């Protein structure tokens, strides 16, 4: 009797929490982020995490090395996105990582070493991409895994507010006028 081990690989949906302090939808999106042209997510990494990206597929090695050589940068935008509850420790140097979900021209995407076919481009719109930037350096570009170019985010609002995707939370609702 011979036993066989079979390995199956499949893509399954996953859900993650992203702080509202790290979410930047297109300001013109109204109350639905999917009506916007782009969505930007902010994250932070320490030097080891950035260094580990050098060997990861899809990352532009030279760009990651350039980000490491530049070191963690504190820009005015990055200081604006820092949530009040986050550590203000300046010794804990962190790299600011930005993920851009949106559309770019095919030529621009290919200039970032992303292989895309002519049929990846949506007519009069562009190529749906995800661009990863560390500090201000693009380090990775790939085709958005969502077939229609949608953003992989949904907001849960306790109470909707016209013109805002964030809505109003419970604390605001129970506040006296």
Locate each region found by the language model.
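Extended alpha-helical, oligomerization-prone segments that build pores/tubes and scaffolds
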Residues: 1-177
